[in-house]
C-alpha cells in the first residue's frame, strides 16, 4: 500500500517572517559563514562552480532551519519554502525585503563589464 504524500507545511505571513528571519540569521552563524566563504572561494566566481559548491551548502543551512517548521529535510523542502516566500513577497514588504537579503547571501553580485570594454567594433 502506498503511503500518503506528506502534507505540505503551511505558514501564515507572520510565521513566514519568523522562519525567513531565522534562515537569514543562520547564515551569520560563524560555522555557516565559514562554510559559505570556503565554498565561494573554491568556486572562484565561476557560476557553474557556484551552483556545484555554494548552492548545496546554502541549501543545507536553510534545511537545518526550515525542518523545524515541517518542511522536509531534502532539497524539495527548500524549494517549497522558496515558493511560499515568493507567494508572500507580493503581500508583505517585510518578507519581500528579507527575500532580497537572502538572495544576496546566496548569489554572487552580478558583475557587468564596463561599457566600452567589450568586443571591438572595428
UniProtKB/Swiss-Prot annotation:
<protein>
    <recommendedName>
        <fullName>Protein C10</fullName>
    </recommendedName>
</protein>
<comment type="similarity">
    <text>Belongs to the UPF0456 family.</text>
</comment>
<dbReference type="GO" id="GO:0005737">
    <property type="term" value="C:cytoplasm"/>
</dbReference>
<dbReference type="Pfam" id="PF14974">
    <property type="entry name" value="P_C10"/>
</dbReference>
<keyword id="KW-0963">Cytoplasm</keyword>
<dbReference type="InterPro" id="IPR026317">
    <property type="entry name" value="P_C10"/>
</dbReference>
<dbReference type="GO" id="GO:0009791">
    <property type="term" value="P:post-embryonic development"/>
</dbReference>
Amino acid at each position: 500500500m502506498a503511503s500518503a504524500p506528506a502534507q505540505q507545511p503551511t505558514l501564515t505571513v507572520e510565521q513566514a517572517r519568523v522562519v525567513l528571519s531565522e534562515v537569514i540569521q543562520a547564515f551569520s552563524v560563524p560555522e555557516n559563514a565559514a562554510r559559505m566563504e570556503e565554498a565561494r572561494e573554491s568556486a572562484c566566481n565561476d557560476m557553474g562552480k557556484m551552483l556545484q559548491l555554494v548552492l548545496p551548502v546554502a541549501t543545507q543551512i536553510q534545511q537545518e532551519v526550515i525542518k523545524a517548521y515541517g518542511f522536509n529535510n531534502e532539497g524539495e523542502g527548500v524549494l517549497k519554502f522558496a515558493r511560499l516566500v515568493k507567494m508572500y513577497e507580493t503581500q508583505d514588504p517585510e518578507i519581500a525585503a528579507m527575500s532580497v537579503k537572502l538572495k544576496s547571501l546566496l548569489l554572487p553580485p552580478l558583475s557587468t563589464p564596463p561599457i566600452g570594454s567589450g568586443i571591438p567594433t572595428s
